[in-house]
Design a protein with these regions (language model features):
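Glycine-rich anion-binding loop/nest that anchors nucleotide
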Residues: 140-147, 170, 174
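Residues that scaffold, gate, or flank divalent-cation-dependent active/transport sites
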Residues: 8-16, 33-45, 51, 55-98, ...
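Short, structured patches in soluble enzyme cores that scaffold and shape functional sites
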Residues: 102-103, 122, 144-146
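Structural motif
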Residues: 6-7, 23-26, 46-49, 64-68, ...
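Non-transmembrane, aqueous-exposed alpha-helical and coiled segments at domain scale
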Residues: 1-4, 8-21, 26-30
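Long, charged alpha-helical interface segments
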Residues: 80-117, 131, 153-238
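Glycine-rich phosphate/diphosphate-binding loops that line cofactor/substrate pockets in enzymes
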Residues: 132-140
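Phosphate/ribose-phosphate-bearing ligand recognition and processing surfaces
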Residues: 145-155
Length: 238
């Protein structure tokens, strides 16, 4: 029996070396884009249109769309709100279409679109995501959004958590050092995750802008079974 591959790409800059058009690609940007996207669907958003540039987001705004947009953590002046999961309240997003542009996450989503299916992953939907991947029995590639093409810890830790769950199914295997390393990192951190996360660079960036109130929430596991999936130009739930 040929095992399905579980691979982890720790930076978008490395994606061309991992690209697999037959794989399910899971995009994760734990702090904060993927957590915000999952939260938006938990709170009833109809669809999210991820765009790579602020120019695209602004053009949608001029057409009357609600826009969430940030760069370096800060809300852009034309946007309705930014990138915190707490921005995506039921009162604000239920039944709506939202255009979304972020520093790292939305570009990673577009990059991943060459895969057979693109899913959005966060701790909030971790087990549901792992169960779906095991059910589908396809190769899986976890794409970490990172920070401006650089490695980051928080996304890699999540990749390890997801990979470990998927590999519990003996139809899957991995000889990918990105996978093995991310699992080792996750297991080193898991007993004191918040203590570990307090060291990461993004924690400092968020604290600098008084945006660190979401860090604990973004590491809560299994608050939902919803899995956002990319369908051409927009995200909806499976």
């Amino acid at each position: 029996m040929e095992l399905k591959k579980v691979e982890v790409c720790v930076s978008p800059a490395l994606y061309p070396y991992y690209e697999n058009t037959e794989a399910i690609v899971v995009v994760t940007d734990v702090l904060r884009a993927s957590s915000a996207i999952v939260t938006a669907f938990m709170n009833g958003v109809e669809r999210i249109i991820p765009v790579g540039t602020l120019e695209e987001a602004k053009a949608y705004k001029e057409k009357g769309f609600m826009v969430a947009a940030e760069r370096d953590g800060l809300v852009r002046d034309f946007a309705d709100f930014g990138n915190s999961p707490y921005n995506f309240t039921p009162e604000r997003v239920a039944g709506k279409q939202i255009v979304y542009s972020t520093t790292n996450g939305t570009n990673a989503i577009h990059l991943a679109s060459s895969g057979s299916q693109v899913l959005i992953g966060a701790y909030l939907n971790l087990t549901a995501l792992a169960n779906y991947i095991r059910q589908e029995q396809k190769d899986v590639l976890v794409l970490c959004a990172g920070w401006k093409n650089k490695f980051n810890l928080e996304d890699t830790l999540f990749a390890g958590a997801l990979a470990q769950l998927v590999l519990e199914d003996d139809h899957f295997g991995s000889i990918c050092d990105g996978t093995l390393g991310s699992i080792d990192l996750y297991n080193a951190a898991r007993e004191n995750m918040m203590g570990y996360i307090s060291k990461v660079a993004q924690n400092g960036r968020l604290k600098k802008n008084n945006l660190d109130d979401v860090i604990g929430y973004c590491h809560e596991k299994d608050l939902t079974d919803l899995i956002p999936v990319l369908n051409e130009d927009h995200l909806h739930v499976l």
